[in-house]
Amino acid sequence: MPDMIQNGRRFITFCKSRREVEVVLKETRDKLSNIEYIPSLLDLTDKIAGYRGGYKKEERKDIEKRLVKGDINGVIATNALELGIDIGDIDIVICSGFPGTKASFWQQIGRAGRRKEAVGILILDVGPIYQYIAVNSEFLLKTGIENAVLDKNNLFIQLAHVRAAAAELPLTLDDAELFPDIAEIIPVLLKAGELKNDGGIFTWIGKEHPAGDFSLRNISRDIYKVINKINGEMLTEMDEYQAFHEVYEKAIYMHDGVQYMVEKLDLVNRIATVFPIEVNYFTVPFTDTMVNIIKEFKNTEFARTTATFGDVLIKEAVVAYKMIQFHNRQNLGFESIRDNLLLPLKQKDYGI
């Protein structure tokens, strides 16, 4: 990427996680800061930016504008930049790992080459899916994209959709064809004061429109704020799952390539207090996952193994973190988290 910036190439590098975006951004800027770019005496570190969920709306808009105008050459992004934004001439797209679906892969690669010839690069790791793609390239290049899969029986997902649907049009129990568990959900919303029963017609009376009240990424509605202790600025907001995995005490939280250490995670007020710091490592949480089998629906024999499909209850606790050195990925050690962060949301799901 430093070479692409030096040669004036415009590019997007897609990463699979927010943390990876920040790590790659910092490491690229570190390399650029050691390059003497005599032709214009510019600070090349300003020619690249990160782009991911968790940046403020005005931050993302500014990055989009700078990329379109050519003020920056490259963006390191999550799939937040995959759709919906026209960013003009891109010479190169780099996918750091297979994004999980062929549909997402083609959306990312298709960011380049819209007006001229361009290059798409897929970097494969050592995981099984990566090795399969390396040997069977036709899987990506010659077959269609996947079907979208949604479990409409998930009560948490149904609840969010029933709330949004009720705000648009009154519901009845006959809507069970669309929402199989509506008979269980409506009493909950009546008790919460969000629906009114008009002779079997249920009308939304909630104070706010519910569609903007839940995330497309997950089902948690508990929002945490990340506050810079030095100036009181709110860096970002995140849901509880992210907070437990990213801003536990002593974690290194990164925003636009800048490092912050978490001083305190207040679970009552849902505030993570951070302060700027410069260290040679980033942190990765270590989790303890507990899976309880509730009910088995189907069993299939594979040689000496039995695969079972059924209901499971998943609980996850963040118990420690490891410190990984920048650039060489050396593990600098583990530290226990003082109070294990057990997610209060116990996720009921289907599993094999």
Language-model features and meaning:
Residues 117-120, 126-140, 161-173, 182, ...:
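Extended Lys/Arg-rich polyanion-binding regions
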Residues 1-170, 175-211, 216-223, 231:
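Helicase motor core with emphasis on the C-terminal RecA-like subdomain
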